Amino acid sequence: MPKPFLILQLRPENETADNEFESITHYGEIKKSEVVRIRAEKSGLPNIDLDDYAAIIVGGSPFNVSDKQEHKSEEQKRVELDFYNLFDRIVERDFPFLGCCSGNGLLGSYCGASISRKHGEPVGGANIFLTEEGKSDRLLKGLPSTFRVLLGHKEACDSLPPECVLLATNDACPVQIFKLKNNIYATQFHPEGDSEGFIIRIHVHYTCIHVQD
């Protein structure tokens, strides 16, 4: 029996988390019977045995790695520590991993990159350009050299993390896809994102802001 994919989510709102999960499984062509789903923002990360899974996928999050420690919630501090401990084992084994948006920031920070708001991008569409390394990468094989994505993020890697390979870029945010070793990938944009999902995220975030006000 094939090993399942492990999808780790960090979104606190059920509506956005559920939509993200549906999008990952739909566009990834992954059967839900082949997935283990963990809402890490609710329960933290359990003791994950990598031998139990085929790969790990991490979605988006409202957390910003670049925030000062004194401004981070205890929940965020716990999540970051949990992921850094998990990355120790992922990197040691070159275990298949895909981090999307916040997964990019977490992995980039772990690898030693400076994360800041210098290269944030507003919610919307953007063109992404594959590098020469990206064009020959086995995971990105078949993608056009330029393609359109949906994104929206406050922070990003200031530069390529040490020992990583840049696979895709654009002018606004130079580090759009990077790879560590052979099987560890991160994207700044949302490869699972579609118009319906982004409308849901915008509506939920707008509502949350006005409720807080």
Where are these regions (language model features)?
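Glycine- and acidic-residue-enriched helix-capping/strand-helix junction motifs
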Residues: 12-20
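Amide-donor transfer/coupling interface in amidating biosynthetic enzymes
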Residues: 7, 27, 45-48, 52, ...
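Glycine/Thr-rich phosphate-binding loops of Rossmann-like dinucleotide-binding domains
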Residues: 15, 65-67, 108
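A short, Lys/Arg-enriched amphipathic alpha-helix followed by its capping loop at the start of a domain
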Residues: 2, 23-33
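Ligand/cofactor pocket segment of small-molecule handling proteins
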Residues: 103-106, 110-150
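Extreme N-terminal starter segment of soluble prokaryotic enzymes
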Residues: 1-7
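Flexible gly/pro-rich beta->alpha loop and the following alpha-helix that scaffold active-site loops
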Residues: 33-98
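Cofactor-binding loop segments of dinucleotide-utilizing enzymes, especially the Rossmann-like FAD-
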Residues: 10, 40, 102, 189
